[in-house]
Amino acid sequence: MKNEKRKTGIEPKVFFPPLIIVGILCWLTVRDLDAANVVINAVFSYVTNVWGWAFEWYMVVMLFGWFWLVFGPYAKKRLGNEPPEFSTASWIFMMFASCTSAAVLFWGSIEIYYYISTPPFGLEPNSTGAKELGLAYSLFHWGPLPWATYSFLSVAFAYFFFVRKMEVIRPSSTLVPLVGEKHAKGLFGTIVDNFYLVALIFAMGTSLGLATPLVTECMQWLFGIPHTLQLDAIIITCWIILNAICVACGLQKGVRIASDVRSYLSFLMLGWVFIVSGASFIMNYFTDSVGMLLMYLPRMLFYTDPIAKGGFPQGWTVFYWAWWVIYAIQMSIFLARISRGRTVRELCFGMVLGLTASTWILWTVLGSNTLLLIDKNIINIPNLIEQYGVARAIIETWAALPLSTATMWGFFILCFIATVTLVNACSYTLAMSTCREVRDGEEPPLLVRIGWSILVGIIGIVLLALGGLKPIQTAIIAGGCPLFFVNIMVTLSFIKDAKQNWKD
């Protein structure tokens, strides 16, 4: 009965600082969009050119860490004393479901165009060599390497959850073995948590900024409603209201059902694209791209282009590594929670094999379709981007498929549901992280969830107002910098504690 009388509420030291920082940055941006774009370009150039190498080494070192976990002294250690909570098939399916966000649909549909129009290694734009390397680079950015880094952090969080029985809702909770309880629960831990929250807020706002134009462009195609910034703002507002209604009326089960529908619909849509786009070409292109990936892998891992300064690794590899870094803690906590009872080796292999298969299927099917449409001159992506923006170009890659109306309805529903679940997850994660006395499995206060969803929505609108991909890329890279150090500290804390307390 004592536990039932716990008083939940905001934790001021991790609620107000991120709110104030993000609020000030949004206000300064809206106040002068042109000046904001100048600052954004400067920040992007500085971080990617001066510190891009650090992100590349981080990924390589974490890959070696994955091998250490799989073949080292903890490989057969079980994460908890209970049997696995989910069957292997359900476990893999839940991993796949976590990959089917609207932001992933965004990049999967258009990424290959950028790789072949501005290719790496001094290749000619739109050349045969650029096209051969295009999908290979997608497989590199969304393949075993980043998932291996997530494996290490997932093992770390699963260890703290199920072996050490810690309640972890913020990264500072895991740092006690590394810096001591005094610092982990004091000013140092508060700073770490605030870095994490500010970065996460911008990351979620970025995802919303990518997802919203896809929905509004679908609306223009299906209903003839012109796509404007005002329409984007209205749609984001509707999502926030819908999220508030779901939370207030206890409709979270409905949100979970929507998440399942999203996963099944993703399978259906990908299968449709695979069949009608050209299954034989897709499989041949994928096979060839795996070979290209293996051939160029050493160069890709360490490519910084300091002599030619073409900008490809800064604009894409460093950006994506920052993307993975910024979502690492949130994603790893989720993957850890669904992996109770599995061994370290099972978790590491399951994540790398299962999640790589998920992202490789997405990027192979969608990227191959886009390349075919370009080669057959069915759509002119450069003109579409110049006149209408990236989202319109993505929509046209789907609208060019047979049964275009049915296809567009499917894509519209998929993007809409994916974004509803995104807003719900955003508000829940941020509210859990900024409230006190809210335990895992409990619902944080309604007003706090609504407040965070509003702020994330505002960030999405601000990024859309700035226009283009550079503000989105910069928000991710800037947010990834502090999380780079936080992720390393969580990793070191796990290693130190495991050596002391996870013995035979």
From Swiss-Prot:
GO biological process: 4-(trimethylammonio)butanoate transport; carnitine metabolic process; carnitine transport
Keywords: Antiport, Cell inner membrane, Cell membrane, Membrane, Transmembrane, Transmembrane helix, Transport
Location of the protein in the cell: Cell inner membrane
Knockout consequences: Essential, it cannot be deleted.
Entry binding sites for (R)-carnitine 1: W142, W323, W324
Topological region Periplasmic: 31-51, 99-131, 220-230, 278-311, 373-403, 467-468
Pathway: Amine and polyamine metabolism; carnitine metabolism
Pfam family, one: BCCT
Parts of the chain that traverse the membrane: 13-30, 52-67, 91-98, 132-151, 187-219, 231-248, 254-277, 312-335, 350-372, 404-431, 447-466, 469-490
Amino acids binding 4-(trimethylamino)butanoate 1: Y114, G315, W316
Binding site for (R)-carnitine 2: Y327, A328, I329, Q330
Outcome of substituting L353M: In strain: O44:K74
Membrane-related topology note: Multi-pass membrane protein
Described purpose of this protein according to its UniProt entry: Catalyzes the exchange of L-carnitine for gamma-butyrobetaine. Can also transport D-carnitine and, with lower efficiency, acetyl-L-carnitine and glycine betaine.
HAMAP family registered for this protein in UniProt: CaiT (MF_01049)
This protein's name: L-carnitine/gamma-butyrobetaine antiporter
Higher taxonomy: Bacteria, Pseudomonadati, Pseudomonadota, Gammaproteobacteria, Enterobacterales
Annotated gene: caiT
